[in-house]
Amino acid sequence: MNELEKVIEINGLTKKFKNLTAVDNLSLNVYKGDVFGFLGPNGAGKSTTIRMMLTLINPTSGNIKLFGKELKENRKDIFRKVGAIVEKPDFYLYLTAYKNLEILGKMSGADISNRNIMQILELVGLEKRYNSKVKTYSHGMKQRLGIAQALLHNPELIVLDEPTVGLDPQGIKEIRELILKLSSEKQITIFLSSHILKEIEIVANRMVIINKGKTLIEGSVKELLNNNTDSITIQFKSSSDINIILSNSEFSKNLFHITNTKLNIELDESKIPELIKLLVENKVEIYSVERRKSLEDYFLKITEKN
């Protein structure tokens, strides 16, 4: 993978709807081979950004380049290399999966052979149901068929906007495995917008977090998590007065939250023994201690701060 080869380059992107600024001077870079996580709370501007990337709406200002070319001037050439799913994919429900892809391939102008269609259906795990009408498909199968549609013209970049919305755990797992497969076996760059943070943590190598249309932070998922303070969860006996103990200690400046029998505190790893010692000395009955760094913790920390 050439990390210096930019597939997506967005600079100063802004979109205003009357008095609402949906995207505000947004900048990000996606490199060849990335599985890039595009994260933000509801209303952060993710879908608006994707719609501008796909020229479904025009930006108020700013610049988008795909494969090093200005999107506005090179739309036709660029989109030969791009596949996308935005919201729920539409199909002819009374036709088979195979027939749908055949028709959609012809509509897109792609030169698709029968063998190509079957290879794509096999790639997304639908080869055994290729002759079934789409109306008999589960939601998860329809999502995989949508990805198959995006693959028809052999793209180098796929844009997925919330591809796991409404799926059960098995469906989410199947989409996750498919994304990893497309990245590792086909070397396709993937731009993945999702609110399921655990999925981004598993599949993405790089990510950006946005809020109120602005870039908060961008970088390697691994490095961002490693630089994040540990979150410690301690289970204790409900009668313990943890709040008073912490407030009168060196840990009073740490961010912590207490429920009836649980303490969540942001803490450097080196300070864990001191915290445990303090609680034990104050006769707190501790039942368990769990240390974790998760994308969810980091996401909440960054978005709440901003």
Placement of each model-derived feature along the sequence:
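Conserved ABC transporter NBD signature motif
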Residues: 62-73, 77-78
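Conserved ABC ATPase "signature" region
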Residues: 102, 106-129
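Conserved catalytic motifs of ABC-family nucleotide-binding domains
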Residues: 154
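Catalytic Walker B motif of ABC-type/P-loop ATPase nucleotide-binding domains
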Residues: 158-162
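ABC transporter nucleotide-binding domain
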Residues: 176-266
